[in-house]
UniProtKB/Swiss-Prot annotation:
This is Cystatin-B. Belongs to the cystatin family. The modification N-acetylmethionine is found at residue 1. GO terms for cellular component: collagen-containing extracellular matrix; cytoplasm; cytosol; extracellular exosome; extracellular region; extracellular space; ficolin-1-rich granule lumen; nucleolus. Able to form dimers stabilized by noncovalent forces. It comes from Homo sapiens (Human). It is linked to Epilepsy, progressive myoclonic 1: A form of progressive myoclonic epilepsy, a clinically and genetically heterogeneous group of disorders defined by the combination of action and reflex myoclonus, other types of epileptic seizures, and progressive neurodegeneration and neurocognitive impairment. EPM1 is an autosomal recessive form characterized by severe, stimulus-sensitive myoclonus and tonic-clonic seizures. The onset, occurring between 6 and 13 years of age, is characterized by convulsions. Myoclonus begins 1 to 5 years later. GO terms for molecular function: cysteine-type endopeptidase inhibitor activity; endopeptidase inhibitor activity; protease binding; RNA binding. The gene is CSTB. It is found in: Cytoplasm; Nucleus. GO terms for biological process: adult locomotory behavior; negative regulation of proteolysis. A motif (Secondary area of contact) lies at residues 46-50. PANTHER family: CYSTATIN FAMILY MEMBER, CYSTATIN-B. PROSITE patterns: CYSTATIN (PS00287).
Length: 98
């Protein structure tokens, strides 16, 4: 992967689900709601001064959210951060930089 360029969209992995799970409470607090389902479906990653993960998450029924999660460099020892998110997404909506 080239530094700065997002990767191609890939199916979510166990690691992707783990990342999404770690920021779930941040999203639920910002949206003031609990999601009955929180299943990572696909993702892109972008290497910057750390890594941005763009994750499509199924949150119930036909509803999806897109998350941008920042993981700092390992030596910084910082928690994952929900940098941004988009609600009202559908299964067919493409993951793009936001």
């Amino acid at each position: 992967m080239m530094c700065g360029a997002p990767s191609a969209t890939q199916p979510a992995t166990a690691e992707t689900q783990h990342i999404a799970d770690q920021v779930r409470s941040q999203l639920e607090e910002k949206e003031n709601k609990k999601f009955p389902v929180f299943k990572a479906v696909s993702f892109k990653s972008q290497v910057v001064a750390g890594t941005n993960y763009f994750i499509k998450v199924h949150v119930g029924d036909e509803d999806f959210v897109h998350l941008r999660v920042f993981q700092s460099l390992p030596h910084e020892n910082k928690p994952l951060t929900l940098s941004n998110y988009q609600t009202n997404k559908a299964k067919h909506d493409e993951l793009t930089y936001f």
